């Protein structure tokens, strides 16, 4: 993996972290209906899983 590809993946990880943080803040505000909060919690979990998968790819490719 070249450095440009690595930077692209690291940027994606950062973007996912920012999105997950924004979603978590919205869930914590508790201003939405329960069904919407449940959906947002699911989105947050999916974002976290995606971040972990990308981090694993980066780790494997930089060995």
For the regions a language model picked out, list residue spans one by one:
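Short, charge-rich amphipathic interface segments used for partner binding and complex assembly
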Residues: 21-63
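Charged/polar low-complexity intrinsically disordered segments, enriched in acidic residues
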Residues: 12, 16-23
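Short, charge/polar-rich alpha-helical segments
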Residues: 1-14
